[in-house]
């Protein structure tokens, strides 16, 4: 399935916030790869919001991001992080297509993936995403298992990094001897590690998941489509 391997690991992180710098460094250190879902219409350090726990969350400026995310995948997260089902079809199309075009121009790579802002979507949103050239899009509905998605445009992750059972799921994944392809798909927001003061949790996750010869480590696009 993946260069002859039956297991794969991938990561998906949203919003292009300053904490991505530390996360990317950690991922590179452990030899894993992921996909970063960006809002091109909001990609500025001046774009800041206050988390309910009091931390100020900043997106990064666009300068230097191509170098930062080198070796990882860039995917769309909509132009302005719009809650897509609340809008008309023209607005939905603009949110997706303009974000896709902007990101392709900035990063010099095709953008075929997306993560739905707020995790919200409906049939109209899915159909428009497909028409815009999006081949997969992540939701926030966890599966708690390792099967490949039947419909990539409503892709459900294995779990979030803060889920209580994440370590147990990793152990199950590593121990699995299934003949079927097994995918461990983790998602989140890197600012959550500052909010929850638990960067050590991600360190432990990466230590457990990395360095296994029988596992393919790839971006979302690589594990889904082999490209």
Enumerate the predicted regions with their spans.
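Active-site metal-binding loops of divalent metal-dependent hydrolases
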Residues: 13-16, 78, 190, 220
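Non-membrane alpha-helical structural segments and their capping/turn regions in soluble enzymes
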Residues: 89-94, 164-167, 196-199, 203
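A short acidic, amphipathic alpha-helical/loop segment
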Residues: 22-26, 124-128, 201, 205
